Amino acid sequence: MAEPLAPGLTRIWDVSEVICDVDTDFQNLVIGRTHQGVSLFSDGERQSTEFSQLVYHEALLVPALLLAGEVEQVLVIGSGEGVVSQQAVSAGATHVDHVDIDREAVRLCAQYLPYGYTEDELRRAEKGSGPITMHYRDGWEFVDRCATSYDIVVIDLPDERTEAVQHNRLYHTDFLRRCRDIGRVVVAQAGCPTLWRNESLHLSWQRFRETFPTVVYFGSDEHEWAFLSGLAEACEDPVARMSARLPTLPYRSLTIDADTLIASTVPPKSLRALDSR
């Protein structure tokens, strides 16, 4: 499996077994065995692996949980594996709306991935018979028509593309504003901080700074991705708030501790330089 990373740079995955290879209405989905365990690919790009998915999903959600404080209502857009929805419930959420446009992909993940939803859990979510309700809808449409207020809105999508694809608009400022209007904290996978692959992160940083009075960066120290949380209210010292709440967080993180919060919330110098222009 050849995964393009940047112009002139490709990562090769040795896939010892192809478990499924399906063209859904929205993407080519491959689930296979790699050296990192069962792994998920969308249109040739790695989305998650059995080995590293917990690091990724905790880096996405835990900072937002800490910023929000008490969490009851959560909206998840994308993140078809279901891990984030499960974590939100473990953190005390009484209701999670999970929105994903690709029904077939979500069901294949539940069928074949050893993490995230089981098939039974997904069936219950599809019926809305537990704390998680699954909605197979376009994320933009769902948010545009939403009358519910959420403690956290999670945006976890395939990377923004240079070519025109459906999900690109869910990265843009208009969509962030809509999410801000219904969520106290909005968090998104924002790109990669490495110098040769950081265009998406720079764009995300500018969009979040235009949209939210408080923006918190979290760069995973054991993964390649960075995440941005935007607060609908001004907060003078968000990292202190996060650190104070960590010991009492109902969800017990295995990959983030107090030292991680301090180290991982310093944005790269190139991002900080954007603010001084």
Model-flagged regions — what are they?
Residues 1-2, 50-187, 191-205, 209-211, ...:
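The AdoMet/dcAdoMet-binding core of the Class I SAM-like
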